[in-house]
Amino acid sequence: MATNRTFTMIKPDAVANGHIGNILAMITNGGFKIVSLKLTQLTVADAKAFYAVHAERPFYGELVEFMSRGPIVAAILEKDNAVEDFRTLIGATNPAEAAEGTIRKAYATSIGENAVHGSDSDENAAIESAFHFAGREQF
């Protein structure tokens, strides 16, 4: 398996609850190298653009409001099989269904406030990384 990259965000709920350090520790302990990292806040327009794929879904408005209500931590991670391995590390969207030892089992409070985002494909990882990090911010 080739080394590749994935994108993650620590969402506003986890940031507000003081879980940044613990989540980053789980990520690095999971064998991921953090190659880009920043604390930022999405505007409503940013959140709408980032989640445009969900625009027709009934939860879209709540998602946009949630993701723009406070700071997030955006990161690009590197590891062999990065996308799939990170999806395993974060766990199921519903924290009640997430496996023990996953980020969402430890830090998510609900399906809507599930602590972290992880790219679902190599293609989306590249798109999502470029959305948050200018070329010279990607190392």
UniProtKB/Swiss-Prot annotation:
GO CC field: cytoplasm
Record gene name: ndk
UniProt main location, coarse: cytoplasm
Amino-acid positions noted as binding ATP in the UniProt annotation, renumbered to this chain: 11, 59, 87, 93, 104, 114
Record note on quaternary structure: Homotetramer.
Record key words, sorted: ATP-binding, Cytoplasm, Kinase, Magnesium, Metal-binding, Nucleotide metabolism, Nucleotide-binding, Phosphoprotein, Transferase
UniProt record, GO biological process: CTP biosynthetic process; GTP biosynthetic process; UTP biosynthetic process
CDD domains: NDPk_I
Enzyme Commission code(s) on record: 2.7.4.6
Catalytic activity: a 2'-deoxyribonucleoside 5'-diphosphate + ATP = a 2'-deoxyribonucleoside 5'-triphosphate + ADP; a ribonucleoside 5'-diphosphate + ATP = a ribonucleoside 5'-triphosphate + ADP
Compartment list: Cytoplasm
Name this protein carries in UniProt: Nucleoside diphosphate kinase
Primary enzyme class: transferase
Catalytic residues (UniProt): 117 (pros-phosphohistidine intermediate)
NCBIfam families: PRK00668.1, PRK14545.1
Reported function: Major role in the synthesis of nucleoside triphosphates other than ATP. The ATP gamma phosphate is transferred to the NDP beta phosphate via a ping-pong mechanism, using a phosphorylated active-site intermediate.
PROSITE patterns recorded: NDPK_LIKE
InterPro entries documented for this protein: NDK-like_dom, NDK-like_dom_sf, Nucleoside_diP_kinase
Gene Ontology terms for molecular function: ATP binding; metal ion binding; nucleoside diphosphate kinase activity
Organism: Flavobacterium johnsoniae (strain ATCC 17061 / DSM 2064 / JCM 8514 / BCRC 14874 / CCUG 350202 / NBRC 14942 / NCIMB 11054 / UW101) (Cytophaga johnsonae)
Cofactor: Mg(2+)
Assigned protein family: Belongs to the NDK family.
